[in-house]
């Protein structure tokens, strides 16, 4: 029992059929009880001229992250794992963003950037804009779930929890931006709702210096979940025959 991987166990004690190499230990899951979460891969967060770039954050390294997310999505779809896409933002009038009575009004760097630089005439993170849209290289397909969210966590004021429970999903595999903000916030909230959370580290990117990426991943693997990578995810989802090494 002590040598068994981490992960959800059914009432009979059976763990999942797929074992993923991860830190701090391997974690097992069943593909039909797992979702791949793609967090906020919008122009706002991953493209020059988007919100993060305009707010002074470095987005120059997001290209390889987008490519690895595409690989993770392809592997998940091939294995029958549900793909869930999040888009962070608000209505065009910013009612959902909250006014001065909301901490979001004071802490959101998008809202602060627009107030500080009104001459830009930007509509950052507003639904229906280029900023809000997913990057061209990543597109949902039929069968995927696309959800908007008005705050960092994908569980806040969204139907995510009920959608997951209705489908018997217990394990959430995370990719996206930003590791230290929306990815970690959603994984933490999932942890408190009894979901097993895994981050594919090389398919995420931080908002801020690299030390924030390192700190977020260390925090997750120590307290809230597991950390793996795209190559390990792809390998774990290969049929047994494909994983065997010829003698």
From Swiss-Prot:
A Gene Ontology BP annotation from the UniProt entry: uracil catabolic process
Record's keyword terms, sorted: Hydrolase
Gene3D superfamilies reported in the protein's UniProt record: Isochorismatase-like
Superkingdom assignment: Bacteria
Reactions this protein catalyses: (Z)-3-ureidoacrylate + H2O + H(+) = (Z)-3-aminoacrylate + NH4(+) + CO2; (Z)-3-ureidoacrylate + H2O = (Z)-3-aminoacrylate + carbamate + H(+); (Z)-2-methylureidoacrylate + H2O + H(+) = (Z)-2-methylaminoacrylate + NH4(+) + CO2
Active site residues of this protein: 40 (proton acceptor), 149, 182 (nucleophile)
Sequence similarity: Belongs to the isochorismatase family. RutB subfamily.
Name of the protein in its database record: Ureidoacrylate amidohydrolase RutB
Lineage: Bacteria, Pseudomonadati, Pseudomonadota, Alphaproteobacteria, Hyphomicrobiales
């Amino acid at each position: 029992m002590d040598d068994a991987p981490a992960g959800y166990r059914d009432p009979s004690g059976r763990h999942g059929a797929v074992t993923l190499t991860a830190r701090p230990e391997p974690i097992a899951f069943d593909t039909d009880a797992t979702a791949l979460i793609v967090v906020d891969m919008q122009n706002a967060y991953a493209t020059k001229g988007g919100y993060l770039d305009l707010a002074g954050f470095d987005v120059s390294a997001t290209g390889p992250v987008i490519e690895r997310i595409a690989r993770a999505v392809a592997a998940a779809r091939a294995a029958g794992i549900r793909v869930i896409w999040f888009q962070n933002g608000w209505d065009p009038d910013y009612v959902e963003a909250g006014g001065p009575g909301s901490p979001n009004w004071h802490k959101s760097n998008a809202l602060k950037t627009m107030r500080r630089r009104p001459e830009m005439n930007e509509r950052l993170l507003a639904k229906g804009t280029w900023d809000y849209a997913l990057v061209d290289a990543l597109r949902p397909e039929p069968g995927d779930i696309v959800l908007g969210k008005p705050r960092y966590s994908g569980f806040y004021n969204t139907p995510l929890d009920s959608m997951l429970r209705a489908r018997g999903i217990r394990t959430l595999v995370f990719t996206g931006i930003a590791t230290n903000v929306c990815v970690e916030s959603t994984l933490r909230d999932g942890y408190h709702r009894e979901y097993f959370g895994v981050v594919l580290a090389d398919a995420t990117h931080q908002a801020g210096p690299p030390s924030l990426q390192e700190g977020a991943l260390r925090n997750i693997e120590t307290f809230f979940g597991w950390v793996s990578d795209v190559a390990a995810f792809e390998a774990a989802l290969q049929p047994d025959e494909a994983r065997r090494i010829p003698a």
